[in-house]
Amino acid sequence: FECMEAIELVPNTDFISSVLAEIKSRWGNGLGVTLSLGEQEESVYQKWRDAGAHRYLLRIESSNPEIYKKLHPQGHSFERRVECLYTLKRLGYQLGTGVMIGLPEQSLLDLAHDIEFFAEVDADMIGMGPYIPHHDTPLGKSIPITPEYMEQQLLLGLKMIAVTRLYLHDVNIASTTALQALAA
């Protein structure tokens, strides 16, 4: 059989709008709807907001533009991602974003800047999880993935969550399955 190496899923904006309208017609504003459909034009975000979406998740992964660039395909813009976050907030969405913790070349200062970034964009929800390389990838083969390494990643993740909670005491911080996997 044929195998597709990669596809880009582009949401059908009219379909999403119709689903949102149906939810709103059945439950009014009593049911909060969260979307996570990537970067869109402002008009699309507005259309979905008008149709009944309340929250939007769009992870930054790293507030360091150089690290961000290494995580995303060529031609993908850090500035565009940040612009989308500010647009979502301005349109009245509860904003969710987040980062990976323990990325290669990521420093503690980068993580501190990530927390400051959450405050700057006025994030309402934050998802943070440890970066866990797979042993069959080039990076996974370059890092000895030992129990000690996994323990360090777990502790770094817990510390990041704790410091974020101290700095941003009223934000929702999601628990991640990746963090749970390290604790097992």
For each feature predicted by the language model, list its residue ranges.
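Conserved C-terminal portion of the radical SAM core fold
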Residues: F1-C3, H54-R55, E79-P138, L154-A174
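Catalytic cores of alpha/beta
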Residues: Q40-D50, L103-A119, Q180-A184
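Short glycine-enriched, charge-decorated loop/helix-capping segments at active-site entrances
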Residues: K70-G75, S142-M150
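Histidine/acidic-residue-rich catalytic or RNA/ligand-binding cores of hydrolases
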Residues: P138-K141, A183-A184
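Short amphipathic alpha-helix initiation/capping segments at coil-to-helix junctions
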Residues: M150-G157, L179
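Short catalytic/ligand-gating loop segments at beta-alpha or beta-beta junctions
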Residues: A174-Q180
